Amino acid sequence: MVENLKQLQERVAVSDGRAKADLVIKNGRIINVFSGEIMDGDIAIKNGYIAGIGSFPDAEKIIDAAGAFIAPGFIDAHVHVESAMVTPAEFARVLLPNGVTTIVTDPHEIANVAGEKGIEFMLEDAKGAPLDMFVMLPSSVPATEGEHNGETLHAEKLHPLYRHEKVIGLAEVMDFPSVAKGSDDILRKIIDAKKEGGRIDGHGAGLTSADLNNYLAVGIRTDHESTTAKEATDRLRAGMFVMLREGTVGRDLLQTIPAVSEKNSHRFCFCTDDKLINDLITEGSINYNIKLAIKNGIDPITAIQMATINAANCHNLPYLGAVAAGYQADIVFLTDIETVEISKVLKNGEVVVDNGVRNEAAFKQQAAVPFVSPPINHHVHLQDLALPLTKETCYVIGMQPNSLFTEKRIEQVTIQGGKFVPTVENDLLKMAVVERHHDTGCVGVGIVKGFGLTEGAIATTVAHDSHNIVAVGVSDEAMKAAIDHITQTGGGIAVVNGAGQVLHDLALPIAGLLSDKSYEEVENDLAGLLNAFKQISTANGFDPFLTLSFLTLPVIPELKLTDQGLFDFATFQIISNEVN
């Protein structure tokens, strides 16, 4: 919030007892994130900020905390709103009951489809919600040069967006080879971010401690891609803030939390990165990360520091992350600090959640933000899905449940008539990526293992990060039926059976990424999709749709598929499906 002179004068008057506070919270046990103590005291709030901690006997309104622990609002240090497949305003409705009052988001999903207009849509839609949504401008649109996306964002296109008060830096720099080569465009983006006083986020998936030197040398200071305690420690020692991730697919917290100690915890914070709406509802958001950390040996106050002041320091947000004078009155009441049971949430001094019930009056009723989605533009034919082969020994994308990484496998496959034929008994299925933005006719076809399909196909327009159409199936006919269906609906997800009949779908009319419906409706459709998937697959224990969407992301090891073909992370090049 931007303050004016009158507001500061009113706050000072409250702090020294000359005026009443708007609100005073009494009888709470305040978690001091600076000292690590639990303290007593009244919390006086004026104009959405904390005016003081101490004795404040009078106020316009008093809340009796009745012994609850008082924590700062939780901060998600790195999240892609689009992965929840709802608009920012709907996203806020899910997060606030989980104690999350601030997010730092990278809207590179919608930017890959719609460029600057997509970023502007996200910023505008978030205005109606009692949630701080800070934006890191997408650094890598597209993620690599080896695929087609909807828009390309060079430095000169990004720079004007820094004028927006909610834009605070440059998002995850994924194109590591361009950094290592000193490419002009990525370095210009980094220089612009520095000039604007912004942070620069990293994306160090698979990078060694030696590789990190390139990142640090140009000013990249954060990373959220650690999957082991060693990787987290390497990044810590290099001078980075380390975000410990727990999302839907990227579930890394249990593997990385051993890196946290009493001496170094101030350099760690939490993020979700990508989390589906159903997981946000059933598990939670950053509150779930806190719970997991506590269950795995982290002191509760330390875990709360990681979720609040550490994240604020990481992103240079000086008035967030603490219950102290001069800080924004973003406050979470906890009935139990060990289990992180939330009873009340305040945003800017206003109660937005009470005993799990949202205060809908706190959400500004604004008209839907207009957004004209780019059309889905392709003409794929059945023959385009064929995979000609001359050798039975092929590279196969080995899907790994609950991981963004894949395995570069070598398998013996079946060939009939010079073409690959999926074999259900070996779980060797066909995968295709269809370029959907410019009708280039580009279709990448490969082989994947891990989905356990017995018939049919699934397809989605959510395909990181270029968001072309991706499908996996037992037959070309079923794959085409699924592709055709989501094309007709303007984007989305579909499950079809062996006869090509649609078992369930979810329409995503906003850029093929977001629903225009409530999060409750999206949750119902996701449940329907999962039930439909179970009808055609023997696999379980992971989300097949978000997992599929990451099999197209070439900046995470080891083997991925783009509209240009099979992408090998180790060489950062397109390779043949056949093993030479």
Swiss-Prot record:
EC numbers: 3.5.4.2
Gene Ontology terms: biological process: adenine catabolic process
Transmembrane regions listed in the UniProt entry: none
Swiss-Prot/TrEMBL keywords: Hydrolase, Manganese
Reaction(s) the record says it catalyses: adenine + H2O + H(+) = hypoxanthine + NH4(+)
GO MF assignments: adenine deaminase activity
Manganese as UniProt keyword: yes
Cofactors named for this entry: Mn(2+)
InterPro entries linked: Adenine_deam, Adenine_deam_C, Amidohydro-rel, Metal-dep_hydrolase_composite, Metal_Hydrolase
NCBIfam families cross-referenced by the UniProt entry: ade (TIGR01178)
Family, as annotated: Belongs to the metallo-dependent hydrolases superfamily. Adenine deaminase family.
Protein name (Swiss-Prot/TrEMBL): Adenine deaminase
The organism of origin for this protein: Listeria monocytogenes serovar 1/2a (strain ATCC BAA-679 / EGD-e)
Gene that this polypeptide is encoded by: ade
